[in-house]
Amino acid sequence: MDILLVLRAILYRLRQGCSWRTLSIFGHWETIYGHWRRWVDMGLWEQILAEFFMRARGKLWGIDSTSCRVHKHAFGGVKGADYQDIGTSRGGSNTKIHALCDAKGKIIDIFLSPGHRHDSNYAELLCDDVPKGITILADKAYDSDRLIQFLKERDVKFCIPSKRNRTSARKVNKGHYKKRHHIENAFQRLKEFRVIATRYEKHRENFLGIVTLGAILAWI
């Protein structure tokens, strides 16, 4: 099957939110899905996004998370919901997307977690490859001694408001902090894709691949 046709089918599903079987309008849906799974298993989408990481622009980068509702068809994956990054919070069953974006609002790194996990648990993963001299913008949910120390050890600056329980609140550059809207806008663009706004995938690798592909398309 022509690879360009396979890509067209995958992009069609990304935008329409249809099932894999619906892609039979492009050819054998099993063949299309087979290509997709091979690319996911190869880590192809993560490799491509890593290339864009090297092209990240500006000095003010942001980290944040957003929750995606989980459709009932996404349940039943091997090893249970938690292993598949599906959790339960007030809003019901959901998966969290944790992301790092550059100063232009382009996502350059992504992790998934069950919806009930706290954002700060994934901050170090997102910031692990951030180069010296970059300023990380984040809301007060990320205010933790551990993360602050982690960033300082790497000579990475930060603009993170203090939580109320801080005995002494740190000063925050309000002009810098306003730039946090870039990552919020990035999440809005991601959720324009129906299969990201609502998770239909049973397997976390499939959903991570879809989210990563959505982030890549913003660069193209």
Go through each PLM region and give its residues:
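Short alpha-helical elements
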Residues: 1-220
